[in-house]
From Swiss-Prot:
GO terms for cellular component: cytoplasm; nucleus; protein-containing complex. InterPro entries: Psome_chaperone_3/4. It is found in: Cytoplasm. GO terms for biological process: chaperone-mediated protein complex assembly; proteasome assembly. Present with 2210 molecules/cell in log phase SD medium. Component of the 20S proteasome chaperone. Forms a heterodimer with IRC25 that binds to proteasome precursors. Interacts with POP2. The gene is POC4. This is Proteasome chaperone 4. Gene3D superfamilies: 3.30.230.100. Belongs to the PSMG4 family. It comes from Saccharomyces cerevisiae (strain ATCC 204508 / S288c) (Baker's yeast). Involved in 20S proteasome assembly, facilitating the alpha-ring formation. Involved in maintenance of telomere length.
């Protein structure tokens, strides 16, 4: 079970409109086994002057269904099952982690863990405005690293 861990800071192209993201990803080094999960830790970049550290806000797990075992699945439905391993009272954070894990698991056909980390003082409303931006940037990073 060979994995590689990468750490990236994803800068915004438009400056202040989208936040800078910190992403740590653990990816399979060998793409033959579809059982090795993709793991992401994602959060907004924190200023170096802040002395408080980010904390775990939500931890979500998603796994693709075996298509040959579930022939009766309706087309158009999700082929991924997921569950929060650590839930949060904030729906915005949970939805972000759930969408990321589900989309990544379906796109790369392997299990996926997504961790969202944030400061206690962080405003989760930033997630609503930047939901698609965060998804796109994380998917682009994974496509590049996994060679797809």
């Amino acid at each position: 079970m060979l994995v590689k861990t990468i750490s990236r800071t994803i800068e915004s192209e438009s400056g202040f409109l989208q936040p800078t993201l910190d992403v740590i990803a653990t990816l399979p080094a060998d793409d033959r086994s579809k059982k090795i999960p993709i793991s992401l830790v994602v959060g907004f970049k924190q200023e170096a002057s802040l002395n408080s550290s980010s904390s775990l806000s939500c931890y979500y797990y998603a796994i693709p269904l075996m298509r040959d075992r579930h022939i009766n699945l309706k087309s158009g439905g999700s082929n991924v099952v997921g569950i929060p391993l650590l839930d949060t009272k904030d729906d915005r954070i949970r939805d972000m982690a759930r969408h990321m894990a589900t989309i990544i698991s379906e796109r790369f056909n392997r299990p996926c863990y997504v961790t969202w980390s944030s400061l206690p003082s962080e405003d989760p409303s930033m997630l609503v405005a930047n939901h698609l931006y965060i998804l796109k940037k994380c998917l682009d990073l994974l496509k590049t690293e996994l060679g797809e």
